[in-house]
């Protein structure tokens, strides 16, 4: 009878990739003879995409020690005026019987040493306990956001009689270990509206973090503010009870060679060969994640700012969303690039800029010698990819917990410059502000200092995963807790 670690991913490609990377790290360290990895995932979610089965087939082929178990299809309860997160959380709860039967089935032929779940899969926590399986959370953002999530039930308790956070324009919240407070309107998107069922779901999830056997985090100790690590370890984030062990095991990011297999070869080669011809650290890379998208008016402001800055740039432009206020795009249908940019922009900047539609191989781009800065939506995976590559950032958050990440990147970690967003206009950024921040990062002494700091952090990221590194030590401590 072999030993297996079972991982349970939330719906969506990003969540599955995160679990795969954790599984690969465990097996890379201990070998498939010590543990096999089984990843449970759902079927039928409204956030599923056609790329998920393609990705799973590829990983199954290249990493045979990772097996996947897909649950039977479940139908979403789609009700009018209910948010996508609320629908998704209800969908996850409907999969609880499949979690139970999967653990039962796997336990017949193997010893389940640990059950690792995503935060949104909290309804599976008591199921793991029911089987006496040590159950852990995998937190796929940084330690500062973990500190905030652990403390969120306390904030909920203190603000029960107030309006929704989205309406508290003059309110800020203090989190243990954070240097600067966070605007209420910049809280994680899931809790902005008290009347959305996702609000109470998120408070429930966060209140259960301390009830697990431990929390595994995709970051490394050297990246995080010491005050945040101390606040978590010292129990300040869970004032009403014990904090479980926390294991920082990152940075876990997808490998370049695996990413490149899914790329559009011709377009990829074009942008990479263009980068190879540019001077060292001279190019600003702009990319806002797989879901990040802007209305045409904002795209024009970005273009004007880039043109006025005089800097070299590689800019990934996604199709503008159908709803003008939305910042998320679903699908990458073709669109007229010239039509969404200022007239003549592409021609006027052709000697120093390149604009690509929808996608670029981000991990590979960030590691190019010519890249000297990164305008990012502050998704945690993108942040880690920039840190590993030693590239400083301009922080432009869009949704999810990205405003929280921005606060920490700019104020606590000091590895990014924040753009000034007009909250009353949906986070709009003017062309003048784009130019100002681009020049600050690429031309100023402050930008150079940021670049030096990021270069050192890149070296520390590599060391953390080495034989004697902090993340390897933390993985060893986690494995000791389950064997």
From Swiss-Prot:
Optimum temperature is 45 degrees Celsius. An anthocyanidin binds at residues 15, 400. It is an enzyme of class 2 (transferase). The active site is at 15 (proton acceptor), 118 (charge relay). Optimum pH is 8.0. One of its GO terms (molecular function) is UDP-glucosyltransferase activity. UDP-alpha-D-glucose binds at residues 140, 360, 362, 377, 380-382, 385, 401-402. InterPro entries: UDP-glycosyltransf_plant, UDP_glucos_trans, UDP_glycos_trans_CS. Its EC number is 2.4.1.-. CDD domains: GT1_Gtf-like (cd03784). It catalyses: phloretin + UDP-alpha-D-glucose = phlorizin + UDP + H(+). Keywords: Glycosyltransferase, Transferase. The keyword Transferase applies. Belongs to the UDP-glycosyltransferase family. PANTHER family: GLYCOSYLTRANSFERASE (PTHR48048:SF20). Glycosyltransferase that possesses phloretin 2'-O-glycosyltransferase activity. Converts phloretin to phlorizin (phloretin 2'-O-glucoside), a potent antioxidant. Is specific for phloretin and does not possess glycosyltransferase activity toward naringenin, naringenin chalcone, eriodictyol, eriodictyol chalcone, apigenin, luteolin, kaempferol, quercetin, isoliquiritigenin, butein, caffeic acid, 2-coumaric acid, 3-coumaric acid, 3-hydroxybenzoic acid, 3,4-dihydroxybenzoic acid and 3,4-dihydroxyhydrocinnamic acid. This is Phloretin 2'-O-glucosyltransferase. The gene is UGT88F2.
